[in-house]
A protein has these predicted regions:
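Conserved AMP-binding A3 loop
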Residues: 31-33, 159-183
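AMP-binding/adenylate-forming catalytic core of the ANL superfamily
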Residues: 88, 105, 249, 357, ...
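Conserved pre-ATP/AMP-binding loop-to-beta segment of ANL
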Residues: 3, 19, 144-163, 170, ...
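Conserved AMP-binding/adenylate-forming core of the ANL superfamily
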Residues: 2, 6, 19-64, 68-72, ...
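Conserved ATP/PPi-binding loop(s) of AMP-dependent carboxylate-activating enzymes
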Residues: 328-332, 343-374, 411
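Structural core segment of the AMP-binding/adenylate-forming
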Residues: 48-49, 72, 76-140, 148, ...
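Gly/Ser/Thr-rich phosphate-binding loop
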Residues: 246-251, 260-321, 334
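Conserved AMP-binding/adenylation subdomain of ANL enzymes
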Residues: 182-199, 207-248, 258, 262-264
C-alpha cells in the first residue's frame, strides 16, 4: 500500500523497521523507534508553542538528526516545513521569514544570532528555537505517555516549501504537497531500489530539495539508514565509507572529482559501495568512466529542479548510459522538448524541457504571476534547453533563463546585481557564470564605477558577503568602462 502523506509513510516505516538504525551521526546510532520518540517529543513542543495546521515552521539546520526530528514533527502538526539555507545572511533571512509567513524559526546557535539582529524587522516570526546538536530527544518516553496525535493530513496539503532563485532578484517559495513528495518518492524508489540493508551517506544539505527527498524521505521510505555528515574532508569521507560500509552516495559532481584525485584513496576498502548518484550540475562526460574504473562502481547522472520535488530523469543501473545524457524520464513523469510556442519539436532538435507528473509543485507561495509563467496546462516549463534522441535519452544544451549553477546551487544574476548596485561606488553591474571544472560555474561580476570612487575587488566582495550567501558571492570582479554584454 502506497503512503498518501509523509506522516503515514513515516509511521509505516517505524512499524516495519523499529529496531533498525536510521540515522548515524557522530557515532550515535538512532533507530526508527528512537526517531519516533524524538519526533513525538518535538511535536509536543511545537504543539505547546501553538503550531497548528497550515502554519509555517522555518528550519535552518545543518545535516544533524534534529533536522529530521523537526521536519517530521512539523508534518505531524499539519504545518509546513520551510527549509532555509544555513548560510543565509541576516539580509536574506529577513526576506525569507517575512515572505514565508514563518511562525517559528528552528536554527543553530549562529542562526539564532542572526535572528536576534533582525527580529524587529520580522512580521510573523516571533519565536526562535536554538538547537544544540545532541540534545536528548531520544530518551524513552515516560510510561503511559501518549504518542503524537497527528493532525488530519490531506494529500494536497503543503508539506515543504523551498526557496529557489527568482528571475526578479527575489527568491520564490516552491510549495511541495504531501502528494507531490510521495509521488516523487515512489519514482525515486523504483529507480534506485534501496533496501533496508542499504547504508547511505548524507552529504547534500537537507535544506536542498535533492537532499531532503533522496537523503531523508527516501531513506525513511526504504527502511534503510544514512550517515549524516555536515563537514567534509577527504580523509573523513573515505574513513566513513570504509567504517560504515556505505553502499550508496548521493552527491554533486565536485565530490566525485575530489575522490578521484585523492592520493590516499587506494588504502581504503570501498567494496561495500554499490551505487553513486549525481546531479545539480553537469558532470564532464569523459570523467564518469575514469571514476567508474577507479572505484568499480556505477555513477548515475540525472536531472531535476526544486519545482518538481526535484528528480525528473535519470540514467539506470540496468541500461548503458550515453555520454553527456541525463538519462530518461522517471516512470510516471512525462518530459517533452518544445519550441517557443509550446509545440513539441522533432527528435534531436533543441528546445525547452517541460515536465508533467504528480511531483510537480503546487505553485510559488503568494506569487500567482510567477506560478502562471511556469505552470501551463499541467506542464512545468523548466527554462532549461535540451534535446531528446530516438531512445528518449535527454541531453541538456543550455539555459533559457539567466542562471548560474555553482556546486549544485542555482544563482540568478539579477539577485547578485541588485546587491552590487546597492554599493555606493557601483554605477552598473553585470553578473555572469564562468566555467569551472570543480564547481561547474563560478559567479563573475563586471562593474562600472561611479566617478571619484576607487574600490578594489576585496571591497566589492566584502560588501556582497554582508547580503548574500557564500555561494552567491562573486569569485571574480572585473572593473570595466562599460557593460558590453547585454542581459
Amino acid at each position: 500500500m502506497k503512503a498518501v502523506n509523509l506522516v503515514s509513510l513515516f509511521e509505516e516505516s517505524v512499524q516495519k523497521h523499529a529496531d533498525r538504525p536510521v540515522l548515524i551521526a557522530d557515532n550515535q546510532r538512532i533507530t526508527y523507534k528512537q526517531l519516533q520518540t524524538a519526533v513525538s517529543a518535538v511535536y509536543q513542543s511545537l504543539k505547546k508553542l501553538g503550531v497548528q495546521k497550515g502554519d509555517k515552521v522555518a528550519i535552518m539546520l545543518p545535516n544533524i538528526p534534529e533536522f529530521v526530528y523537526y521536519c517530521f514533527a512539523t508534518f505531524q502538526s499539519g504545518a509546513v516545513a520551510v527549509l532555509l539555507n544555513t548560510s543565509s545572511t541576516s539580509y536574506e533571512l529577513t526576506y525569507l521569514l517575512n515572505n514565508s509567513d514563518a511562525k517559528i524559526l528552528v536554527t543553530h546557535p549562529s542562526g539564532e544570532k542572526r535572528y536576534q539582529e533582525i527580529k524587529d524587522k520580522l512580521e510573523t516570526c516571533y519565536t526562535v528555537l536554538a538547537v544544540n546538536p545532541g540534545q536528548n530527544h531520544v530518551a524513552a518516553e515516560p510510561a503511559g505517555s501518549p504518542g503524537p496525535l497527528s493532525a488530519a493530513i490531506d494529500p494536497d496539503d503543503p508539506a515543504i516549501m523551498i526557496y529557489t532563485a527568482g528571475l526578479t532578484g527575489k527568491p520564490l517559495g516552491a510549495v511541495l504537497t504531501h502528494a507531490n513528495l510521495c509521488s516523487e518518492l515512489d519514482m525515486v524508489h523504483a529507480t534506485f531500489r534501496r533496501t533496508p540493508d542499504d547504508v547511505g551517506l548524507c552529504l547534500i544539505p537537507l535544506f536542498h530539495s535533492f537532499g531532503v527527498t533522496v537523503n531523508m524521505l527516501n531513506v525513511i521510505q526504504a527502511g534503510c539508514s544514512t550517515v549524516m555528515m555536515d563537514r567534509l574532508t577527504m580523509d573523513g569521507l573515505f574513513s566513513t565509507l570504509e567504517r560504515e560500509k556505505i553502499t550508496y552516495i548521493v552527491a554533486v559532481p565536485r565530490l566525485y572529482m575530489g575522490m578521484v584525485f585523492y592520493e590516499k584513496a587506494a588504502k581504503y576498502d570501498l567494496s561495500s559501495l554499490k551505487l553513486c548518484v549525481t546531479g545539480g550540475s553537469a558532470m564532464p562526460a569523459d570523467f564518469i568512466p575514469v571514476f567508474e574504473q577507479k572505484f568499480s562502481v556505477r555513477i548515475l547522472e540525472g536531472y531535476g529542479l526544486t519545482e518538481a520535488s526535484p528528480a525528473c530523469s535519470f540514467n539506470r543501473m540496468e541500461t548503458v548510459a550515453k555520454p553527456g545524457s541525463i538519462g530518461t524520464a522517471l516512470e510516471g513523469i512525462d518530459i517533452k522538448i518544445v519550441d517557443e510556442d509550446g509545440r513539441e519539436v522533432p527528435r534531436n532538435t533543441i528546445g525547452e524541457l517541460i515536465v508533467r507528473g504528480g511531483n510537480v509543485m503546487k505553485g510559488y507561495y503568494k506569487d500567482e504571476a510567477a506560478t502562471a509563467s511556469v505552470l501551463k496546462d499541467g506542464w512545468l516549463y523548466t527554462g532549461d534547453l535540451g534535446r531528446m534522441d530516438e531512445e528518449n535519452y535527454i541531453f541538456l544544451t543550455g539555459i533559457k533563463k539567466r542562471m548560474i549553477i555553482t556546486s549544485g546551487f542555482n544563482v540568478y544574476p539579477r539577485e547578485v546585481e541588485t546587491i552590487l548596485n546597492m554599493h555606493p561606488a557601483v554605477q552598473d553591474a553585470l553578473v555572469t557564470g564562468k566555467e569551472d571544472l570543480l564547481r561547474g560555474e563560478l559567479v563573475k561580476a563586471q562593474i562600472v564605477l561611479r566617478d571619484g570612487f576607487h574600490p578594489d575587488e576585496k571591497d566589492i566582495i566584502r560588501h556582497c558577503k554582508v547580503y548574500l550567501s557564500p555561494y552567491k558571492v562573486p569569485r571574480e570582479v572585473e572593473f570595466v568602462s562599460a557593460i558590453t554584454q547585454v542581459p
